[in-house]
Every structure is written in structure tokens, then in C-alpha cells.
Amino acid sequence: MADRVLRGSRLGAVSYETDRNHDLAPRQVARYRTDNGEEFDVPFADDAEIPGTWLCRNGLEGTLIEGDVPEPKKVKPPRTHWDMLLERRSVEELEELLKERLDLIKAKRRGTGS
């Protein structure tokens, strides 16, 4: 019989308690603006630290209108294969290896060409 009473009810998903006579948690609203000029509000807890940027629903990043300007992120140049190679060997060593490999290839060509 208990199954019939709960049928159709979303247990745990819906609170059946009324919202009257309850104090909501203190909040602060931060306003952001995207590069295309769209403004949107994001509610935060009163004691939360407000981030300088927030992702808008349209996919663009919004900047906090009133508040600290976010520091630009440091962008490291991408490490190329050549950079990683130079970390392990000097240019002189690489030239020596190249000469050895070229001599080896030339010797193979002479041996198979005759």
C-alpha cells in the first residue's frame, strides 16, 4: 500500500516544504559584460570571492563590470621539437651526428649501386 502512495512522486528531487517564513542565504550579485556588449548577472554567496571573469551562456567570457580587473594570463611560447632537441644536445653534437648519418647513407648507396 505504501507503494501506491508514493507512486508518481519524485523522491528527493522536490521539497514539499513551503518557502514562506524562511530566510534565504545572503547573496551578492555580480554583473559581467562580454566583448559583444551583452551584460548578465551571476548570484554568489555573500562571503564568496567573486572571480574577475565568468563564462556567459552564449559561450563568450564576460569581464566583471564593477571590481578588480583580472590579470592577463601568462602565455608561454610553445616548445618546439627543435627546442627540446637543443636541451639535450649542442649544435656541434647535432652537426657531428648529421655528418655520421650522411656518411652512413652514402656508404649504403655505394654498396648497393655497384
UniProtKB/Swiss-Prot annotation:
- InterPro entries hit by this protein: RbpA_sf, RNApol-bd_RbpA
Q: Name one GO biological process term.
A: response to antibiotic
> Which keywords belong to this entry?
Antibiotic resistance, Transcription, Transcription regulation
Ranges in coiled-coil conformation:
none
Q: Name one GO molecular function term.
A: bacterial-type RNA polymerase core enzyme binding
State its role. Answer: Binds to RNA polymerase (RNAP), probably stimulating transcriptions from principal, but not alternative sigma factor promoters. Partially restores transcription in the presence of rifampicin (Rif) in vitro; overexpression leads to an increase in the Rif tolerance in vivo, with smaller colonies. Seems to act by removing Rif from its binding site and preventing its further binding. No longer stimulates transcription in Rif-resistant RNA polymerase (with mutations in rpoB).
Protein name (record): RNA polymerase-binding protein RbpA
Q: What species was this sequence derived from? A: Mycolicibacterium smegmatis (strain ATCC 700084 / mc(2)155) (Mycobacterium smegmatis)
